[in-house]
Amino acid sequence: MASSAVIKLALVVALCMAVSVAHAITCSQVSANLAPCINYVRSGGAVPPACCNGIKTINGLAKTTPDRQAACNCLKNLAGSVSGVNPGNAESLPGKCGVNVPYKISTSTNCATVK
């Protein structure tokens, strides 16, 4: 019984000493979360709730400057690769979902300046 407690204590100490590793946001995460937004950025109209949920998810994952820059680059690439995107619709999307994104969703955004 005592050895079980020692093992548990050792595991707790090891976990406390572990260095946390930052995981950058991936473009596949951004694409998957924003797939419900495609029709809106092409045609306008009502923003689907699933789209806003995706934007909120991505914004919530972007806690650090590198994460925000990675998300920005993914959004910039998506905006340029999806055919028929209306730039105004893409730019207005965060505001319509009540999300404060610290950069413009545009193919001209300089993501290196995002903090």
Curated annotation (Swiss-Prot):
PROSITE patterns: PLANT_LTP. One of its GO terms (molecular function) is lipid binding. SMART domains: AAI (SM00499). Keywords: Allergen, Disulfide bond, Lipid-binding, Signal, Transport. InterPro entries: Bifun_inhib/LTP/seed_sf, Bifunc_inhib/LTP/seed_store, Plant_nsLTP. Residues 1-24 form the signal peptide. GO terms for biological process: lipid transport. Pfam families: Tryp_alpha_amyl. Disulfide bonds join C27-C74, C37-C51, C52-C97, C72-C111. It comes from the Eukaryota. Plant non-specific lipid-transfer proteins transfer phospholipids as well as galactolipids across membranes. May play a role in wax or cutin deposition in the cell walls of expanding epidermal cells and certain secretory tissues. Belongs to the plant LTP family. This is Non-specific lipid-transfer protein. The lineage of its organism: Eukaryota, Viridiplantae, Streptophyta, Embryophyta, Tracheophyta.
